[in-house]
Amino acid sequence: MNYRIIISTLLLVTGLFARTWVETTTAQPSEPIWTSNSISDRHIEINFDLGGYFVTELPNGKKQISFPGGVPNLEEGAPDLPKMAQSIIIPDLAHMELSILEADFIDFPLDNIISSKGNLTRNIDPASIPYTFGKAYETDKFYPPNIVFMRDPYIMRTVRGQAIVFQPIQYNPVQRTLRVYTHIKIDVQENGLSQINPLLRRPANSGSNEFENIYSEHFLNYSRTSRYETLSEQGPMLVICYGDFMETMQPFVDYKNYKGLPTEMVDVAEIGGSDEIEAFVETKYYEDGIAFILLVGDIDQIPSPRYSEGAGSNSPSDPSYGFMAGDDYYPEIMVGRFSAENTTHVVTMVNRTINYEMNPDPTADWYKKGSGFASDQGPGDDGEMDFEHLDNIRDDLLGYTYTVVDQVYDPSG
């Protein structure tokens, strides 16, 4: 590893939530750069380069560290530092092993790094939770201890993936030193077999244009992987419909088949409750390769699985119908719902959908209008208040094709 120590004082702009970009290799704020070299489908090298980071000074005198694209670690009572993950495609049965080949860092003297309040659920007001400072603040060690680690493998329809998490910023509270890794190079290769989420079975007609597009954006090594080349096609779609709405939904089904998306509609009464629906969907997935499910009816008419974890325990979960393979939460099927209570609602949804797809009007003004809704809470992503985050999104939209983006923000929104 290469080491550099820089003794410097960070001069922050005064004011509420003042934020300063600290350059390591890049003058302007930018997301880290990922590059990869696929030596084979069982062996890949990855480079991670960080050009700088933000220091946000909070009203309580504490400082928050972030960088573009990073997310907080959410370990309660530990220094609130950012991390970033990227997924790679891995062999169906392999155990992958990671080693660090290169790591360059810079040390900055810095104190008063804020702690994390942990992973708060939506029913908890962050302002009601006090900051705590745990064991990491009393230990003469850099936190987090690992700058790179791998999560468990997962399955996404026809491919098996694994997320690699980079934690390029560490903090030693005793030495009051912030360590920033500007460059990390790792090697990931197969080493034996894994018992965690092996990919043992694929659906029939597994090619799907929509999922191929997801793979290309989601996996760092997708474009360099030839093992999973398939003849891609659209769909198919399964419509599970409340019986009283079947006739009203038929034009939608006919249209989808007409445009080349094989679509089948089934009365939910012929299937049963959520357990029976899950079993029915699994059969359709492996036998027909369905890529879409559309539920038609409200929750009392088309039930969904319920789980008892976190806030909103026992709440219905439509997306759970799409989890077919493995014990992860990556979908094999995309799930949607026409949440209709009566046929009038269904007619509206069917007509709007068909008209939108058949008669697009790219010159219409509404295509170029948007609205942003934000609370007065924060800081969150990139150390930004909610309204600041929405303003950044608004700037991006206005710089693209949008002409109007409303700002509906607390407390006046």
Which residue ranges define each predicted feature?
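Sec-dependent N-terminal signal peptides
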Residues: 3-14
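Short secondary-structure capping/junction motifs at helix and strand boundaries
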Residues: 4, 288-292, 364
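Extracellular pro-sequences of secreted precursors
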Residues: 18-295
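Generic domain-boundary/flexible-linker signal
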Residues: 175, 304, 381-383
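A domain-level signal for caspase-like cysteine endopeptidase catalytic cores
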Residues: 237-265, 331-413
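Short, conserved secondary-structure transition motifs
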Residues: 272, 297-303, 377, 412-413
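Hydrophobic or amphipathic alpha-helical targeting/insertion segments
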Residues: 280-320
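Metal-dependent DNA phosphodiester-chemistry modules and their immediately adjacent helices/loops
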Residues: 309-343
